[in-house]
């Protein structure tokens, strides 16, 4: 069912001796919404620009179906881009901007007019055709940029952090809008962002990138709940890392792990474990339970910060050994013990089975943040 | 982006630009440097052997006096431009935005008008029986006409008149960038008007002052037609000397050496300007 | 006082700047021969000007020189600005520096160096030498004007055009040139005016075969008063004013 549309293999690129992409392989399926997620300098923009044809890989190939695009100039690729700051032609009207790509294809005038009008109607800008870009709001410019790219009916639409210039509320609206467009058009979207929330809420699949290497490729849920490594776990969402030590491996596909002196039974992870081995126990803030200090379960600590977030109450708890724990609880107004004061002693626990285990990694030396290429 | 189809275009542009600058800027300047260390020759302008005679001649009291006088007039011109221009630029930056555009426009209109013609217009005013003298006499302020034309003052007035916009424009641009917050912050921290001026306004506008000096001082030594029209034979600029040596006296080595003097002055001013910009954290050009 | 002092001061300085120009214009209509007294309204100096064949010839020569110098320097200057903006190449800083030095150097230094060059290579002083010289001193101004426009230019625009199917040439024609057009026009007008106004450089590199207006004016005003100059100056003033308004209008319109 899932058919590969765009196939990237062994892509390698260096800028001034620095590896931006390192033998990267990625298959993009037909009709999916895939997001390239990572911090600045991770190579996501370079990767996107390579698909568009603005950068050339030092090594590797880009293929669309069975057509090799590696050396095809951008104007001959059936892919179109929505640029970060829209890149609308300032000297052309909205209509002429959208018509530009069709004029390049030398389409008949009548057809151009109809298709441009359709595209503008699709982004609800049919009344703005004669305006110049600078007479539009940021959100409207964004819509024009999208209309201009999709009017050519590309096989793949490349979106380079298209929402980063919009304010929070507008960004949410545009996220929904983009999802709707993608469903209606059935075009494959490749979306670049450094905003993990955006990536999780919009995508069918997320590619987490760091230093030109794919850290993880999976559905938003997989990436969030089962991060492949510490980087992904840290980058996507907030996470508590508890130090654990394997006590013993049980016969029934479970292991017993010592966490803060508590013996907990976890499902056996998919990496090999042996007794005495250290590992990380990952728990999302929403998986943490804050209990009364006289509860028999849990680790003792005290509340050092309480942040009211509307639907949730976020706390920071200092355990006795100094570990900092983030907890995010949904309101339960019927629970009288729910609210704790600052400095109040509490116990911290979680439901077994919600944890995620990762092996310890040799800590990489802290590296200078590169520029986003 | 750097596709192969662009390479010939890129190469052609670079060759054209480099060619133009090498042939019409670098080579000619090297020729001048070369000429300045050669011997004067009535037939072919210059000839061997190499000599530093031209530079020695610069120190000849006769010429030294002319140069110092020229430097004095240029310095006076610059000072007058600065004294008029600094408050002017300040006041201009305080005017409402709409009027500012118009006022800037009015400032550059004279700059776009032929400078010879404008110098000549000054002559109409300053001449012995010109408008100023006639006006003052009919008002009874003076009894007989003053000698205004063909004086040092006339040359300075002419130079100021031609060069004032070049002082004002860079000053205006630094005053435009001078944010009101700085002044408020300074007042807020207890500085009075005078100490705010000395400690905040002056350092921040210094690059503009130096740019203005650079744009006024050097031309004020080179615009030879101003003394020709207003100054008579006793108020010459370095420019007049160079022109005479090249076109009349045919002493190329000496003219070349004099022009190198001007170039060195330029280099010095550019260096000072860079330094002042770096001090307030802007990149020098 | 706080409001009136700066305004009075501004007005005073503008007055000083404009008095000579007003005097010039008024006296261009003066019937008097001596030049200092008012002798009634007349167009005689304009008539004299237009009947002076050498003067009219010099005017045409100047106009043609300014047109060609502005055009050539805009072409080369625009290409230079594009190269500086788009390409990375060795010696870019040197190139930038050289342009800056040309702009800042006293005109007379440029003038004698070009004279030396032209004599060395045996170029007949005339139209060609004037053109080469004028293009050289106009060049940095054009480069700066175009560079300023390019620095505000979104790097993604050419890419967007390519992305939508334009090849390099089409992109240049449909996007790059239209976007930098105002700067090209402004640069051209600046070059035109600089060329038309130049005395210093032209004094050195022109020959008897090609007399231009500033030099003709120069020889007229060096001694005594020539009322025709008033008329000529007024004409030049009107001409530059039209050009200036045109250029400002273009720049303002493009900013919208």
Curated annotation (Swiss-Prot), chain A:
Protein name (database record): Spermidine/putrescine import ATP-binding protein PotA
Chain positions recorded as ATP binding sites: 38-45
Family under the similarity heading: Belongs to the ABC transporter superfamily. Spermidine/putrescine importer (TC 3.A.1.11.1) family.
Oligomeric form and interacting partners: The complex is composed of two ATP-binding proteins (PotA), two transmembrane proteins (PotB and PotC) and a solute-binding protein (PotD).
Pfam families: ABC_tran, TOBE_2
GO molecular function annotation: ABC-type putrescine transporter activity; ATP binding; ATP hydrolysis activity
Functional note: Part of the ABC transporter complex PotABCD involved in spermidine/putrescine import. Responsible for energy coupling to the transport system.
């Amino acid at each position: 069912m899932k058919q590969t549309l765009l196939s990237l293999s062994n892509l390698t690129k260096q800028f001034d001796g620095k590896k931006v992409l390192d033998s990267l392989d990625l298959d993009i399926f037909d009709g999916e919404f895939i997001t390239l997620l990572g911090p600045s300098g991770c190579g996501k923009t370079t990767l996107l620009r390579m698909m568009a044809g603005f950068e050339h890989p030092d090594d590797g190939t880009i293929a669309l179906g069975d057509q090799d695009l590696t050396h095809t100039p951008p104007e001959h690729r059936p892919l179109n881009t929505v640029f970060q700051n829209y890149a609308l032609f300032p000297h052309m009207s909205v209509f002429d901007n959208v018509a530009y790509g069709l004029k390049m294809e030398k389409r008949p005038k009548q057809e151009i007019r109809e298709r441009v009008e359709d595209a503008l109607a699709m982004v609800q800008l049919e009344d703005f055709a004669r305006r110049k870009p600078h007479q539009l709001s940021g959100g409207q410019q964004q819509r024009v940029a999208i209309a201009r790219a999709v009017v050519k009916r590309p096989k793949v639409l490349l979106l380079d952090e298209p929402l980063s210039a919009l304010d929070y509320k507008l960004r949410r609206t545009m996220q929904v809008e983009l999802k709707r467009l993608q469903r209606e058009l059935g075009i494959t979207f490749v979306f670049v962002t450094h905003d993990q929330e955006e990536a999780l809420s919009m995508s069918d699949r997320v590619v987490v990138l760091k230093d030109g290497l794919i850290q993880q490729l999976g559905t938003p849920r997989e990436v969030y709940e089962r991060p492949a490594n510490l980087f992904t776990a840290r980058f996507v969402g907030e996470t508590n890392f508890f130090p654990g030590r394997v006590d013993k491996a049980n016969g029934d596909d479970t292991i017993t792990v010592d966490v803060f002196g508590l013996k907990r039974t976890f499902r056996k992870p998919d990496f090999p474990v042996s007794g005495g081995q250290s590992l990380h126990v990952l728990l999302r803030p929403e998986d943490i339970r804050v209990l009364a200090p006289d509860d028999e379960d849990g680790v003792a600590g005290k509340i050092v910060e309480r942040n009211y977030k509307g639907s949730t109450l976020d706390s920071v708890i200092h355990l006795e050994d100094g570990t900092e724990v983030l907890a995010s609880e949904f309101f339960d107004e019927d629970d009288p013990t729910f609210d704790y004061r600052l400095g109040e002693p509490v116990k911290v626990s979680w439901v077994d089975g919600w944890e995620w285990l990762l092996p310890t990694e040799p800590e990489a030396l802290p590296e200078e943040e590169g520029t986003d290429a | 982006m750097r596709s192969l189809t662009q390479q010939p275009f890129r190469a052609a542009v670079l060759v054209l630009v480099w060619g133009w600058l090498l042939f019409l800027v670098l080579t000619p300047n090297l020729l001048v440097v070369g000429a300045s260390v050669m011997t004067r020759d009535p037939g072919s302008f210059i000839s061997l052997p190499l000599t530093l005679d031209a530079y020695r001649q610069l120190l000849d009291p006769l010429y030294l006096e002319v140069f110092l006088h020229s430097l004095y007039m240029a310095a006076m011109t610059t000072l007058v431009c600065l004294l008029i221009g600094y408050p002017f630029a300040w006041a201009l930056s305080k005017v409402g935005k709409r009027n500012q555009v118009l006022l800037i426009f009015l400032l550059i209109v004279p700059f776009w008008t032929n400078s010879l013609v404008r110098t000549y217009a000054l002559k109409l005013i300053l001449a012995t029986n010109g408008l100023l003298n006639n006006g003052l006499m009919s008002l009874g302020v003076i009894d007989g006409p003053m000698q205004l034309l063909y004086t040092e003052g006339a040359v300075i007035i002419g130079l100021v008149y031609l060069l004032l916009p070049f002082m004002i424009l860079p000053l205006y641009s630094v005053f435009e960038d001078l944010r009101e917050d700085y002044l408020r912050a300074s007042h807020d921290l207890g500085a009075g008007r005078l100490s705010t001026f000395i400690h905040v306004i002056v350092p921040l506008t210094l690059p503009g002052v130096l740019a203005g000096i650079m744009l006024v001082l050097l031309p004020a030594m080179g615009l030879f037609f101003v003394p020709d029209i207003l100054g008579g034979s006793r108020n010459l600029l370095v420019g007049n000397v160079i022109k005479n040596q090249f076109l009349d006296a045919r002493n190329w080595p000496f003219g070349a050496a004099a022009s190198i003097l001007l170039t060195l002055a330029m280099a010095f001013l550019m260096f000072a300007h860079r330094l002042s910009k770096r001090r307030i954290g802007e990149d020098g050009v | 006082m706080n409001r009136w002092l700066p305004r009075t001061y501004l007005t005073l300085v503008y007055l000083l700047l404009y008095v000579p120009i007003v005097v010039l214009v008024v006296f261009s209509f003066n019937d008097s021969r001596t030049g200092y007294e008012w002798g009634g309204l007349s167009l005689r100096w304009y008539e004299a000007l237009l009947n002076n064949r050498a003067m009219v010839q010099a005017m045409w020569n100047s106009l043609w020189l300014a047109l060609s110098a502005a055009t050539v320097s805009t072409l080369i200057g625009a290409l230079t600005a594009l190269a500086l903006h788009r390409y990375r190449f060795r010696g870019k800083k040197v190139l930038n520096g050289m342009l800056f030095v040309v702009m800042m150097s006293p005109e007379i230094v440029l003038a004698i160096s070009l004279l030396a060059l032209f004599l060395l290579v045996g170029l007949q002083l005339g139209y060609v030498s004037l053109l080469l010289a004028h293009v050289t001193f106009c060049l940095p101004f054009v480069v700066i004007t175009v560079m300023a426009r390019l620095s505000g230019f979104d790097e993604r625009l050419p890419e967007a055009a390519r992305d939508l199917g334009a090849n390099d040439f089409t992109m240049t024609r449909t996007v790059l040139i239209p976007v930098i057009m105002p700067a090209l026009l402004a640069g051209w007008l600046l070059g035109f005016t600089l060329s038309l106004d130049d005395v210093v450089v032209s004094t050195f590199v022109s020959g008897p075969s090609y007399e231009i207006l500033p030099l003709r004016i120069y020889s007229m005003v060096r001694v005594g008063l020539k009322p025709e100059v008033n008329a000529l100056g007024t004409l030049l003033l009107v001409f530059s004013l039209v050009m200036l308004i045109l250029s400002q209008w273009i720049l303002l319109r493009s900013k919208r």
